[in-house]
Curated annotation (Swiss-Prot):
This is Peptide deformylase. Its EC number is 3.5.1.88. It comes from Levilactobacillus brevis (strain ATCC 367 / BCRC 12310 / CIP 105137 / JCM 1170 / LMG 11437 / NCIMB 947 / NCTC 947). CDD domains: Pep_deformylase (cd00487). It comes from the Bacteria.
Length: 186
């Protein structure tokens, strides 16, 4: 399992590189990477386990964040409905956003990142809805439509695979500026 000491921090060149495509079938090393990326998220979202291991809670973790420049990320969006089901959970491999809404969305509290230790205030404008194509750990192709928070989480993780950090999207002169029609997500 990855610990906070394994998370690459802002300033490391791997976070600014274009990650390499992953080949199938997955090597044993890539299978273990996928398992470890998801395990971090599962453990970090359990308050007792999070405290026990000294983790920061996360909803996404990309391979470059653990020093591996490959197009792989885990996403575990916590349940928001009473049914207890996550709106999106998977290891996304070689993900591509194939369509996106014109409508922008942003988190009211801004975004954070396990690789960025400092608070970077400001709205991070993203597409409110996306259609995502990716492969899972078995090499099966998926195409899903996501909106609001799950869409934002996936865009954040995909940015990591292309050498972009969330604060690159923040307006440097007016970090809290936004279009009137931007959807603000709690």
């Amino acid at each position: 399992m990855f610990l906070m000491k394994d998370i690459v921090r802002d300033g490391d060149p791997v976070l600014r590189q274009e990650a390499a495509d992953v080949t199938f079938p997955l090597s044993e090393e890539d299978q273990q990477l996928a398992k470890d990326l998801m395990e971090y998220l599962v453990v970090s979202q359990d308050p007792e386990q999070c405290k026990k291991y000294g983790l920061r809670a996360g909803v996404g973790l990309a391979a470059p964040q653990v020093g591996v420049s490959k197009k792989m990320a885990s996403v575990l969006v916590p349940p928001v409905e009473e049914d207890g089901k996550s709106p999106f959970t998977d290891v996304i491999i070689n993900p591509v956003i194939i369509s996106e809404s014109v409508q922008a969305g942003a988190l009211t509290e801004g975004e954070g990142c396990l690789s960025v230790d400092k608070d970077v205030p400001g709205f991070v404008p993203r597409h409110d809805r996306i259609t995502l194509r990716y492969y899972d750990v078995n090499g099966e192709k998926h195409q899903v439509r996501l909106k609001n928070y799950p869409a934002i989480v996936c865009q954040h993780e995909i940015d990591h695979l292309h050498g972009t950090l969330f604060y690159d999207h923040i307006n440097k002169d007016q970090p809290f500026s936004r279009d009137d029609d931007m959807i603000m997500i709690e």
